[in-house]
UniProtKB/Swiss-Prot annotation:
This is Transcription factor himB. InterPro entries: Zn2-C6_fun-type_DNA-bd_sf, Zn2Cys6_DnaBD. Signal peptide: none annotated. Residues 352-361 have a biased composition (Basic and acidic residues). Keywords: DNA-binding, Metal-binding, Nucleus, Transcription, Transcription regulation, Zinc. GO terms for cellular component: nucleus. It is found in: Nucleus. It comes from Aspergillus japonicus. Gene3D superfamilies: Zn(2)-C6 fungal-type DNA-binding domain. Residues 22-51 bind DNA. Transcription factor that, with himD, probably co-regulates the him gene cluster that mediates the biosynthesis of himeic acid A, a ubiquitin-activating enzyme (E1) inhibitor. The gene is himB.
Length: 515
């Protein structure tokens, strides 16, 4: 950098390109005063320091532009020769941009004597303020969309379904899933069951202490209930789920070593409550079945009658009870693993057989295993009746591609109201039927896996029985388990056959791999 000294040993100069302040005063952002032209400033004179002046930044840029002007003119001439067929206004716009840029540089340098400084930026002075996501030179900025490498802990963020508006809290009728007024009462019960079963998430289980489910599905319309956003959670890819104590499912305390698998009475109570409600649901569906399903509806069309609830409420409750049973069985498997240290088989046999249901081979006590099998069998019976009603409805319409019920013929089975985001599937019965069949298949697949995993537990020492002991091997109870295994296999085959028939009427010839 060329420097010119005034006073002292330097030559006196009145070059207008020099700064108004000497280098020391300019660096310290201080005013520069001198007694006469060519003399040292007051501060340099008092400090006995050399007083030098440098050319301002604005004048240096102007000098550089003048030196580079011939080269710039030559380059511009070459560009004009290469693009001589382009419109002239493009060259004019480029020249105007160059002039505006030069004018902005001059305006920025007018106050350079006062504003120019070499101070650090806030992010450089305080590293904590620096954000790697906003730095274009930082390598992490291009990788910030990957949750596994993002330098921010995403486990603390809860993305709720209600906040994003992607899905409704429940797959089917929110009136019977998330709270519904019981007949003759004014209290409402809120449950936090979601479609987590379909995506592998543990469902938010209902509490028996709060009242559980309504004993009888109401015939009223949908009930609007405000749920907190924290009640629902969506997991990000690559990020483990995070549960807070406010919405974490209630887990039973680990049982003591050597105790039966069902040591906690809370699981027994929930299992018996679920079985009782499954029986009431099965009784309500079976008692309303008609002989001629192609003419008379399964349930009356009216949803205002207190004595005749609609079929949609019973179908919706069947899905809900199946989801709750899945949660109970998952809790039993987890508790069994914690108490015995034995992990149940992850890939059990896909079909229920008599040897799989042998009580001698199970870690559960006979009564608990019987309740588990009874609940699963009730669900199979309920879905068998509902699938037959769907098949009769599809046959009554006479359509093989579209499942639209004529206005003159009431539907044999009314499906639950399914709403995905802002899309109400009530107007598209074919899509509602396909989605309902997918739900049935998913629930039965999960239940079959859990039931067979529980039935294939190794025998617990506390439950080990001799094959000669009266009441087990060769007894009526053991023979009953054989018959139950055959009945379960028959129900599964029947449901698969009906689902294939319905899909064939809807235009879907293919069938999924087994229930």
């Amino acid at each position: 950098m060329p420097r010119h000294e005034r006073g002292g040993s330097g030559t006196s100069s009145s070059d207008l390109r020099l700064r108004k302040a000497c280098d020391r005063c300019h660096a310290q952002k201080l005013g520069c005063q001198r007694e006469a032209i060519g003399a040292k400033c007051v501060r340099c004179e008092k400090a006995d320091k050399p007083c030098t002046w440098s050319i301002s930044l604005r004048n240096r840029r102007a000098s550089t532009r003048k030196e580079q002007l011939p080269v710039h003119a030559q380059q511009q001439q070459q560009q004009q020769q290469q693009h001589q067929h382009q419109p002239q206004h493009a060259t004019m716009a480029r020249n105007e941009n160059n002039e505006e840029q030069a004018q902005e540089d001059d305006n920025d340098d007018e106050d350079e004597d006062i504003l120019y400084s070499d101070q650090l930026t806030p992010s450089e002075a305080i590293p904590e303020l620096h954000s790697p996501l906003g730095d274009p030179h930082n390598r992490l900025a291009s990788e910030s969309l990957d949750p596994t490498t993002m330098p921010i802990d995403l486990t603390s963020f809860l993305i709720s379904d209600g906040g994003l508006g992607l899905m409704t809290p429940s797959l089917t009728n929110p009136g019977s899933w998330l709270g519904e007024t019981q007949l003759g009462t004014t209290t409402t019960t809120t449950t936090a069951i979601t479609t987590a079963t379909l995506i592998g998430e543990p469902p938010r289980f209902w509490s028996s202490a709060t009242g559980g489910l309504p004993h009888t599905p109401s015939a009223g319309g949908l009930t609007t209930i405000d749920l907190p956003p924290a009640a629902f959670e969506m997991n990000l890819p690559g990020v483990p789920p995070s549960y807070t104590p406010s919405h974490q499912p209630d887990q039973p305390p680990p049982p003591k070593t050597g105790t039966p698998a069902l040591s906690d009475p809370q699981w027994l109570k929930e299992l018996f409550d679920n079985n009782a409600r499954l029986y009431r649901n099965w009784h309500a569906v079976s008692s309303n079945m008609t002989t001629n399903q192609t003419i008379n509806p399964l349930f009356p069309m009216s949803t205002t009658s207190q004595s005749h609830p609609s079929s949609a409420a019973f179908a919706d409750e069947a899905v809900q009870l199946s989801t709750q049973l899945i949660h109970i069985l998952r809790g039993l498997l987890h508790q069994h693993h914690e108490s015995t240290g034995h992990r149940p088989p992850t890939t059990p046999k896909p079909r229920a057989r008599a040897e799989d249901l042998d009580p001698d081979h199970s870690g559960l006590d006979p009564g608990s295993l019987l309740i588990v099998l009874s609940s699963y069998f009730r669900i199979l019976e309920i879905f068998t009746m509902l699938s037959h009603a769907l098949e009769a409805t599809a046959a009554a319409t006479g359509s093989t591609t579209h499942y639209h019920t004529p206005r003159a013929t009431p539907p044999i089975l009314r499906l639950p109201a399914i709403v995905v985001g802002s899309l109400d599937l009530a107007s598209n019965t074919s899509l509602s039927t396909v989605l309902f069949l997918e739900v049935i298949e998913d629930l039965l697949t999960t239940l079959a896996t859990l039931v067979l995993s529980i039935a294939q537990w190794p025998s617990h020492p506390h439950h080990a029985t001799s094959r000669r002991e009266p009441g087990w091997q060769g007894s009526d109870l053991h023979a009953g388990s054989d018959r139950l295994g055959l009945q379960i296999q028959g129900k599964e085959d029947e449901i698969r056959r009906v689902i294939r028939a319905i899909r064939a009427r809807l235009g879907r010839k293919g069938d999924k791999a087994g229930v």
